[in-house]
Structure formats: C-alpha cells, structure tokens
Amino acid sequence: MFDLTGKTAIITGSSKGIGKSIATQMALHGAKVVVSSRKVEACQIVADEINEACKDSEGEAIVIPCNISDKTALQMLVDETRAQLGKIDILVCNAASNPFFGSMMDIPEDAFDKVMNNNIKSNHLLCQMVIPEMKERKDGSIIIVSSIGGLQASTVIGTYNISKAADIMLVKNLAAEFGPDNVRTNAIAPGLFKTDFARALWENPEILK
C-alpha cells in the first residue's frame, strides 16, 4: 500500500487546484504536509479541511505562507518547516505564474521575467535548499509540476510553455546528479484541468478542440 506515515512534505501553491489535491492525498496517506501559498487565510481553510479528514489517522497539515518570488520567503518556508516538523522528506514544487495570454510578440518584459522567476528560478532555489539534507540522509523525493505545455507548442501561452520545458530539464539534471544518493526527482506534466489557473484555456472552445 502507498504509505507516507512519518514523512513530511512541502507543497507550494497548495491552497487550491492541483496543489490542494496533492496535499490532501499525501496527508490522507499519512504524511505531515505544509500547505503553502501567498494568502495565509486560503491556506488555513485547506489545512483545516485536511486535518478534519485526517483526524483518525497519522496525516496532518500545517500552514506556512510563502511568496515564491521572494528568495527570503522561500528560505523561511524551508526553515520553518524544519522547525515545526523536524525534516523535509518531500518537496512538491507546484506554484507557478502565467500573467500573460497572447502572442509572444506582445508579452511585456516584466511579465516574461515573472514567469521565468516564479516557474523556474523558485523551483531551483527550493531544490538547492532541501537537497543537501536529503543527500545526507540518502533519501528524499522532489516532484516538480511541469505541464503538457512543456512538451508541446502554443500560440497563446508560449512563455509559460518555455518555463515548463525548462522545469523538465531541471528535473532530468537533478535526477542525474542526485539519483545515486537516493534523492528521487520527477516531473508531472498535467494536461488541461478546470482550475482557476487555467481558466483562460478551458473557457475557450477553440483551444478545447
């Protein structure tokens, strides 16, 4: 059986959507999970739901808010997780940004930078912060939520797709380097889900075709 009892997990962007589902399922399978996004109130609602669902099991949820665009906030997320839960067994990099929908010819430079910083750099920084602990312990798991967009082209979310393709290569390189230390690094490439994040896509009937 799939059992995460005794494991601790950070899941970024877990106040809704895919991240919320990942955090919930990990807790239901015994993990202690950190629900994290920018808004503490939204995180607390999810954590309360998880704790209610897990009240008769080992799983539980705590809240540590974090703005992934801020390196100091990322380090605080890691440090506070260790302070409250003792260790980090699993890192799920799910949080991402896509502030622009349209031609790559029209994306403002600041929007381009935001996508690259939030979708690639923040994941890289978090991995740098947690891998040394995992390597020393000879055990750890990193999951980066990429996208089907990292594997195919788009006429309307090109910059986002570039960032998700980079995430896949980030995973491959980390797996090659730290796999021998039993630090397992994998990517998930979800298709189109009816989440708020992807609303501009699933509300467009032409794209759905």
Model-identified regions with their sequence ranges:
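Conserved glycine-rich cofactor-binding loop
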Residues: 8, 15-17
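Conserved glycine-rich Rossmann-like NAD(P)H-binding loop of the short-chain dehydrogenase/reductase
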Residues: 29-46
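Substrate-binding pocket helix/loop in short-chain dehydrogenase/reductase
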Residues: 102-104, 108-116, 208
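Active-site loop-to-helix junction immediately N-terminal to the catalytic Tyr of the SDR YXXXK motif
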Residues: 107, 153-161, 173
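Active-site helix of classical SDR
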Residues: 127, 163, 171
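Alpha-helical segment proximal to the catalytic Tyr-Lys
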Residues: 132, 176-180
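Residue(s) in the substrate-gating loop at a strand-loop-helix junction
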Residues: 147
